[in-house]
UniProtKB/Swiss-Prot annotation:
Protein name: L-type lectin-domain containing receptor kinase V.4
InterPro entries linked to this entry: ConA-like_dom_sf, Kinase-like_dom_sf, L-type_Lectin-RKs, Legume_lectin_dom, Prot_kinase_dom, Protein_kinase_ATP_BS, Ser/Thr_kinase_AS
Record-level GO BP terms: defense response to bacterium; defense response to oomycetes
Organism for this UniProt entry: Arabidopsis thaliana (Mouse-ear cress)
Lineage, top ranks: Eukaryota, Viridiplantae, Streptophyta, Embryophyta, Tracheophyta
Principal localisation: membrane
Family to which this protein belongs: In the C-terminal section; belongs to the protein kinase superfamily. Ser/Thr protein kinase family.
Length: 658
């Protein structure tokens, strides 16, 4: 039991940070660490140099009750690209240290961890897993391509050639200096007092069952209660780029299931020859002269003829979506006269692209929008690269003077909020249409949270931001509040934004949006679509009905369908409607711990998973926070159709993830 609780405690702390930035802090870089072509590197093009990148906050490693190191797991992705394809520099290491960064460290064979004076000193309290690409006789290295476990010094107490064991148990070599992405997993078991290290290639379809290194030793004498974690690398007479893609730390010894895209890292930069430099300088001088002449002519003609000024800045080159000319949009919208509506960030106009019959919707960001540029950048950098059938497609953008424009596919049926509530002379949505809309938006959110290369938090899920196409398919739009994150990073943001009634309570308290706050808003969205009612309905001057609370009350009274509009409730849909209402209450629960993630929501709506029998007891329980700290995830109890599980009140209804 103490091991389980200890694992939970360290999990809750360590799960808060991953990759290079997180809610608690950042990787603090020292020495030659920096960035090259958008990738974090521990070393640059300098010889005999070292670089370090350490978390800026301490990590508790020990169970205070018995002063033993608790179980933990570390997974990180790296690549090493040396200037000589056949010869490495010195290498890199994952380091657990009592200090943030290691002062007085040396480069070359010491990997930026130790120096000649303190190498092997028992007072160091340093644990390292080295990825060594240089054979140093003084440390007993077996070759120039090996992995080792080091305690307080550079002489490895456990080592092996770099490689992995395939499914048949056969050893396969891996080159640490190939320049390709490699994965290292470090697992320590408190119970078995065993440290396992596995090296593998993310390109393989399986994860090795057998570790490369296995050290049977209690780490408690060497690791203090509070430590720092990070990475270090060094160069010698040969230089190399040591790339860090991402890293993850968790409590327990389970290997996280990580599905990342595999990038191609840039090779070591080649030095230019003297002749090349002379030609380059001469060419640049000539180009500069021509540019000056051209600029003078351009200014002259600009002042005489050009009336529309469109500035193409550096950030626009990297955004991806097509840039439209202002004149093109002006003509398409007939001078911005076909107004479709007005939202929190500007007006939306209908248009038809010149030379085609393609209809578009153009959003013009208002002049008085204080965060106009910020929201504009967020939207084009996010939705412009997303491709999903239930997301509104961004065709391109335009910037004219101080005005910002976004060009979308035109949705002829407008926004969903126009169809939800009973209005005179308006056809009501059938239950089948409502259920399909719910599943469409669930699929879109699952894509944003779990299936794209980066995690996207929408932050403003509501019927007004759901558009209906000509086939009555629902598409999620308005990414003006969206936030983008690398996979594996803690997806949180510090600015409270969104529509008030859809904002989760923890977002109001902490100001940090997560995938869980999106799930909360989606739960309310499900209730609003299913019931055909607004979230807040005023029955009398002094009587307001909160839809989520009322639905739960109807459920407690034994008839959850009482919350539904009469025209919907009387359709032949009782079981399906009851499922959606219960799932909506669950997703919009005040306690983050029992909300399912969107992948589970999609499976439940599709009939692949079922809700537990005692879900009402779980929703009503008051001690959810205590469950999340002491119990296993309840989603593991969710069973396939035909085998409904029963949950106890000591299990949280979520899995710890992004």
């Amino acid at each position: 039991m103490s091991r389980t609780i200890g694992s939970r405690v360290i999990f809750l702390i360590l799960a808060l940070f991953c990759c290079t930035e997180n809610s608690r802090g950042k990787l603090v870089m020292q020495g030659s660490a920096g960035f090259f072509k958008g990738y974090r590197t521990l070393t640059s093009t300098k010889k005999h140099a070292y670089g370090q990148a350490f978390e800026d906050e301490i990590v508790p490693f020990k169970n205070s009750a018995n002063d033993t190191v608790t179980s933990f797991s570390v997974t990180f992705f790296f690549a090493i690209a040396p200037e000589d394809k056949h010869k490495g520099a010195h290498g890199m290491a994952f380091v657990i240290s009592p200090t943030r960064g290691i002062t007085g460290a040396s480069a070359d064979q010491y990997l930026g961890i130790f120096n000649k004076a303190n190498n092997g000193d028992s007072s160091n309290h340093v644990i390292a897993v080295e990825l060594d690409i240089n054979k140093d006789e003084e440390f007993g290295d077996i070759n120039d391509n090996h992995v080792g476990i080091n305690i307080n010094g550079m002489r490895s107490i456990k080592f092996a050639p770099a490689g992995y064991y395939d499914q048949e148990g056969q050893f396969k070599d891996l080159s640490l200096i190939s320049g390709s992405l490699l994965r290292v997993t470090i697992l320590y078991s408190q119970m078995e007092k065993q440290l396992n290290v596995t090296l593998s290639s993310p390109e393989e379809a399986y994860y090795p069952n057998k570790p490369l290194l296995s050290l049977n030793q209690d780490l408690s004498p060497y690791i203090l209660e509070n430590m720092y974690v990070g990475f270090s690398a060094s160069t010698g007479s040969v230089r190399a780029m040591h790339y860090m893609l991402s890293w993850f730390v968790h409590g327990g010894v389970d290997v996280p299931n990580l599905d990342l895209g595999i990038p191609t890292f840039p090779p070591y930069p080649k030095e230019k020859s003297l002749v090349y430099r002379i030609v380059l300088v001469t060419s640049l001088a000539l180009v500069l002269f021509v540019a000056l002449v051209a600029s003078a002519l351009s200014i002259f003609f600009y002042r005489r003829h050009k009336k529309v000024k469109e500035v193409l800045e550096e950030w626009e080159i990297q955004c991806g979506p097509h840039r439209f000319a202002y004149k093109e949009l002006f003509k398409a919208t007939k001078g911005f006269k076909q107004l479709l509506g007005k939202g929190g960030f500007g007006q939306v106009f209908k248009g038809t692209l010149p030379g085609s019959d393609a209809e578009i919707a153009v959003k013009r960001i208002s002049h008085d929008s204080k965060q106009g540029m910020q929201e504009f950048l967020a939207e084009i950098s996010t939705i412009g690269r997303l491709r999903h059938q239930n997301l509104v497609r961004l065709q391109g953008y335009c910037r004219y003077k101080e005005e910002l424009y976004l060009v979308y596919d035109f949705m002829p049926n407008g926004s969903l909020d126009k169809y939800l509530y009973h209005r005179a002379n308006q056809e009501q949505l059938t239950w089948n249409q409502r259920f399909k809309i719910i599943k469409d938006i669930a699929s879109a959110l699952c894509y944003l949270h779990h299936e794209w290369v980066q995690v996207v938090i929408h932050r403003d899920i509501k019927p007004a931001n759901v558009l209906i196409d000509h086939q009555m398919n629902a598409r999620l739009g308005d990414f003006g509040l969206a936030k983008l994150y690398d996979q594996g990073y803690d997806p949180q943001t510090s600015r409270v934004a969104g529509t008030f009634w859809y904002i989760a309570p923890e977002l109001i308290r902490s100001g940090r949006a997560t995938t869980g706050t999106d799930v909360y808003a989606f739960g309310l969205f499900m209730l609003e679509v299913s019931c055909g009612r607004r979230l807040i309905e005023r029955r009398t001057a002094s009587d307001e009905v909160v839809l989520a609370e009322w639905t739960l009350k109807c459920w407690e009274n034994g008839d959850i369908l009482e919350a539904v509009n009469d025209g919907i409730r009387h359709e032949d849909n009782r079981e399906q409607l009851e499922l959606v209402l219960k799932l909506g209450v669950l997703c919009s629960h005040q306690a983050v711990a029992i909300r399912p993630d969107m992948s589970k929501v999609v499976q439940i709506l599709g009939g692949d998973l079922q809700l537990p029998d005692n879900l009402l007891d779980i929703v009503k329980a008051e001690k959810v926070r205590m469950w999340s700290e002491t119990s296993e995830s309840v989603l593991g109890v969710l069973t396939s159709q035909g085998s409904i599980g029963t949950l106890t009140l000591t299990e949280p209804f979520t899995s710890r993830g992004r």
